[in-house]
Regions:
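Amphipathic, non-membrane alpha-helical segments that mediate helix-helix packing
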Residues: 1-16, 22-76, 89-104, 163-181
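Phosphate-proximal small/polar/acidic motifs at interfaces that engage nucleotide phosphates
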Residues: 68-71, 77-181
Length: 181
């Protein structure tokens, strides 16, 4: 390809250093190669930005699923307190938990009141009874403004947990975006 052409032109120029044509060819090949590298860099930057957008979408989906699980927890708890069968609600909640697990690594703990607590694999609470903790897309100052994954700790600044997500769609997106090519 272009790299081989550049090195061949460079070799030709070194064998005939007094001739201007081979030197001109080296400059032309170097310019073409530099333009190609600039285009590749622009394409990679755009791909990283597009993946960062997908991270934001997946964070929103994750938060929607945790809200669904919390709402179903409340309905299950109410149904079972009043003696009603909550199996359909439990099935819906299980489906939401399974969908959540495709996005981020989670573990669950069923409580005696019929609710399920959902945690990240590192133990951060995502759902506790009818309450949720959100993931937040945080623009990174040291990663070209791309999104990191934050955990809403209730303060002014979320805790960055990107490195603590070990599986699921979010981990895959982070790995592709931040991996070495």
């Amino acid at each position: 390809g272009q790299l081989n052409e550049f090195f061949k032109a460079l070799q030709d120029a070194t064998t005939t250093p007094s001739q201007t044509t081979p030197r001109s060819v080296v400059l032309a090949k170097a310019s073409t190669l530099a333009s190609t590298f600039h285009q590749i860099n622009a394409d990679l930057t755009e791909t990283r930005r597009a993946i960062s957008v997908q991270i934001g979408v997946t964070i929103s989906e994750t938060n929607g699923l945790t809200r669904t699980i919390a709402e179903l927890n409340g309905k299950i708890k109410s149904a079972e307190i009043s003696g009603q069968n909550a199996n359909d609600l439990r099935d819906q909640r299980d489906l939401a938990i399974n969908q959540l697990a495709t996005r981020v690594d989670v573990s669950t703990l069923e409580r005696s009141d019929g609710t399920v607590s959902v945690f990240t694999a590192r133990g951060l609470v995502l759902v506790e009874q009818e309450t949720t903790r959100n993931l937040i897309g945080v623009e990174s100052s040291d990663n070209q403004g791309l999104l990191d994954i934050g955990y809403d700790i209730g303060g002014t600044k979320p805790s960055i947990i990107s490195d603590f997500i070990s599986s699921g769609k979010l981990r895959g997106l982070l790995d592709v975006r931040d991996g070495t090519i």
